[in-house]
């Protein structure tokens, strides 16, 4: 099950560590959604092709393309540079949909007060990062994650590094954030 917490402000230590505040300050999933619009679903990773929740998500949201990515030093070409790029604060013009099939990692997202929230994802976690939110990704200390990526149509994975506040997706995101993300995409 996904865990979410406010991150400390430490930037000099390993990004793959948990980076809890002292004392730790956790969020529940409804609060994560209200602050960021990030959605979470529990999926049967061992039989994801037949998972009813995933099937419904794909049908309702038009996810017609998917692929698989494995992030580890052994499997990812140009590993160090890819991780550096993943951890650079950025946004996308489309949702970022990830289902963890194996391993673990962290998605960091900014809340409505510009604080970093760390989302720990493990096998069976599916998260949807909304278009227009500043975020980043890193592996944890296990240095391994295998995930399915879902897209509407042909895959477009273009990161727009911060600042990108002039993009329409960012303006739309901020409008929805101001409204505490009235749930439009219920499954």
Swiss-Prot record:
InterPro entries the record matches: ARD, ARD_euk, RmlC-like_jellyroll, RmlC_Cupin_sf
Regions crossing the membrane: none
CDD domains from the UniProt entry: cupin_ARD
SUPFAM superfamilies to which the protein is assigned, alphabetical: RmlC-like cupins
Molecular function GO terms recorded: acireductone dioxygenase (Ni2+-requiring) activity; acireductone dioxygenase [iron(II)-requiring] activity; iron ion binding; nickel cation binding
Subcellular localization(s) per the UniProt record: Cytoplasm; Nucleus
EC number: 1.13.11.54, 1.13.11.53
Cofactor section: Fe(2+); Ni(2+)
Cofactor binding note from Swiss-Prot or TrEMBL: Binds either 1 Fe or Ni cation per monomer. Iron-binding promotes an acireductone dioxygenase reaction producing 2-keto-4-methylthiobutyrate, while nickel-binding promotes an acireductone dioxygenase reaction producing 3-(methylsulfanyl)propanoate.
Pathway this chain belongs to: Amino-acid biosynthesis; L-methionine biosynthesis via salvage pathway; L-methionine from S-methyl-5-thio-alpha-D-ribose 1-phosphate: step 5/6
Protein name: Acireductone dioxygenase
Organism for this UniProt entry: Drosophila pseudoobscura pseudoobscura
